[in-house]
A protein has these predicted regions:
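N-terminal leader/targeting pre-sequences
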Residues: 2-166
């Protein structure tokens, strides 16, 4: 029987190969890890690592896929695209900036860790320009409900800079 990490790696490889097979597709990749510099709202002793791909296909689809490990077993986490590099500590990428912190205006993905602290998921989102300084952040808590009184997803526990056609 294949171990979950091997299955996740195969799934990510299958996803990447299938998505990049179409001519004109753009692929951005990020390897996420712990922050190394203390900053407000950042956890520096995280053991979370992840691999992420954003694929913009020639037919107009944009898909984000994240595979992570080192999460708390059974935990739920928010993943967001952020403006700038990890060391810039900027806010969430928004289609209409400044705007509402909603699934429709930002790139959100939910990760739910299994008993071994691993998670993998993907989401199709509205197209956005991959040829700009962006990073991918895993937050300590799941995505909040939207609307009045919605809370933030907590501190940042892992980050990786998106690199186009990496």
């Amino acid at each position: 029987m294949l171990r979950p990490t091997i299955l996740a790696a195969l799934a990510a490889l299958t996803f990447t190969v299938a998505a990049t097979a179409s001519p004109g597709a753009q692929v951005a990749r990020a390897e996420l890890g712990a922050y190394t510099t203390a900053h407000t709202g950042v956890v520096t002793d995280s053991t979370v690592t992840a691999d992420a791909h954003v694929v913009a296909t020639s037919d107009g689809r944009t898909i984000l896929r994240v595979t992570a490990e080192g999460l708390a077993p059974g935990g739920s986490y928010a993943v967001h695209v952020h403006f700038g590099a990890c060391t810039d500590y900027l806010g969430h990428f928004q289609y209409q900036h400044p705007g509402a912190a909603t699934r429709d205006n930002e790139v959100w993905l939910d990760l739910d860790a299994n008993a071994a602290g691993r998670a993998s998921d993907q989401v199709q989102v509205a197209p956005f320009n991959l040829d700009q300084s962006l990073s991918l952040v895993i937050h300590q808590h799941s995505n909040p409900d939207t609307g009045p009184g919605a809370g933030p997803p907590g501190p940042r526990i892992a980050c990786g800079n998106l690199e186009l056609n990496a």
